[in-house]
């Protein structure tokens, strides 16, 4: 199996659940978007996936997207899966989609081309149950971007915990955003979890805020023994 991997909570938790089910993950597949506006792929601090790959002790294959075109994103994903299929003889792709039929259909069409299975461990999972499970399973998750009404600079750089999850739930009810952030309302990076052999520590970062949305730009991370 290969796992579409962005380093955020969804792809990492899907990887975790796949391994819990006894699936062997041979490689991580990471696409580097041309723009933060990508409909298919996560972009903030995507370079850190190489360190997360080391923490997981799973090899990573990357490919860079050169435009904002959906067709270009699709073609670059096709190239990535073709490479994984050739090099690792994969039989399936794990992805972290929860409710996006658009995303799932795009991924599924490529899987059908290579006759491999699309595995979606989070599909249709209740948002609160999912977010709570992340904490129950000792995932250390930092919020690295916000871009929705109700989410301000207070959340940028914070580590998800039970207290701020309750606050996020109330705000999601009030402002109507997805608690799981699947619509891009916020982005995350996983710093530690049970399948990491090492944990990540952020050494340097900077917050940017334009009045409506913001990002934590991480410039230095290192790996620590657990």
Predicted features along the sequence, with ranges:
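Nucleotide-activated chemistry modules centered on ATP-dependent adenylation/adenylyltransferase
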Residues: 1-226
């Amino acid at each position: 199996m290969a796992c579409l991997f962005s380093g955020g909570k969804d792809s990492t938790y899907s990887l975790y659940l796949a391994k819990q089910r006894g699936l062997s993950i041979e490689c991580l597949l990471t696409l580097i978007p041309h723009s933060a506006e990508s409909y298919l792929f996560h972009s903030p601090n995507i370079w850190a996936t190489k360190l997360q790959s080391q923490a997981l002790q799973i090899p990573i294959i990357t490919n860079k997207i050169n435009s904002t075109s959906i067709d270009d994103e699709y073609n670059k994903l096709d190239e990535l899966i073709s490479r994984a299929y050739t090099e690792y003889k994969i039989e399936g792709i794990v992805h972290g989609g929860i409710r996006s039929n658009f995303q799932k259909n795009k991924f599924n069409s490529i899987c059908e081309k290579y006759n491999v299975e699309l595995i979606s461990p989070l599909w249709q999972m209740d948002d609160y149950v999912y977010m709570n499970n992340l904490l129950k399973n000792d995932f250390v998750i930092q919020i690295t971007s916000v871009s929705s009404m109700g989410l301000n600079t207070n959340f940028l750089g914070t580590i998800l915990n039970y207290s701020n999850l309750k606050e996020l739930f109330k705000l999601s009810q009030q402002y109507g955003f997805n608690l799981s952030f699947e619509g891009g309302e916020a982005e995350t990076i996983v710093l530690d979890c049970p399948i990491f052999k090492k944990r990540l520590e952020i050494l340097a970062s900077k917050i940017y805020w334009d009045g409506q949305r913001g990002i934590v730009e991480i410039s230095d991370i290192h790996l620590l023994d657990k």
